[in-house]
């Protein structure tokens, strides 16, 4: 473990690249996790879930004139 940490901290360029790579990977995983949670939490409120209800009755509207 110490040798891996030593190799990462040996040069500043490797250290910075490791930080940027880790941040990039974390951002991707975090984005996917939050989107999945958001869609599960708002299941009946999202457009993709209620679109059928609104488009289904679109041509059936009657004019009272």
Curated annotation (Swiss-Prot):
Keywords from UniProt, A to Z, are: Electron transport, Membrane, Mitochondrion, Mitochondrion inner membrane, Respiratory chain, Transmembrane, Transmembrane helix, Transport
What transmembrane ranges does the database entry give? 14-34
Outline what the protein does: Component of the ubiquinol-cytochrome c oxidoreductase, a multisubunit transmembrane complex that is part of the mitochondrial electron transport chain which drives oxidative phosphorylation. The complex plays an important role in the uptake of multiple carbon sources present in different host niches.
Gene3D superfamilies to which the protein is assigned, alphabetical = Cytochrome b-c1 complex subunit 9
**InterPro entries xrefs:** QCR9, QCR9_sf
Describe its membrane topology.
Answer: Single-pass membrane protein
Protein location: Membrane; Mitochondrion inner membrane
What does UniProt give as GO cellular component?
Answer: mitochondrial inner membrane; plasma membrane; respiratory chain complex III
- Signals that turn on the gene: Expression is also regulated by SSN6.
Q: Which GO terms describe its biological process?
A: mitochondrial electron transport, ubiquinol to cytochrome c; mitochondrial respiratory chain complex III assembly
Describe its assembly: Component of the ubiquinol-cytochrome c oxidoreductase (cytochrome b-c1 complex, complex III, CIII), a multisubunit enzyme composed of 10 subunits. The complex is composed of 3 respiratory subunits cytochrome b (COB), cytochrome c1 (CYT1) and Rieske protein (RIP1), 2 core protein subunits COR1 and QCR2, and 5 low-molecular weight protein subunits QCR6, QCR7, QCR8, QCR9 and QCR10.
Q: Does the keyword Membrane apply?
A: yes
Gene coding for it? QCR9
Q: Which GO terms describe its molecular function?
A: ubiquinol-cytochrome-c reductase activity
Description of the deletion phenotype: Leads to decreased vegetative growth on several carbon sources such as citrate.
What family does the entry list? Answer: Belongs to the UQCR10/QCR9 family.
Asked if the record carries the keyword tRNA-binding, the reply is: no
Q: What is this protein called?
A: Cytochrome b-c1 complex subunit 9, mitochondrial
Where it mainly occurs, coarsely classed, is membrane
Organism the protein comes from: Candida albicans (strain SC5314 / ATCC MYA-2876)
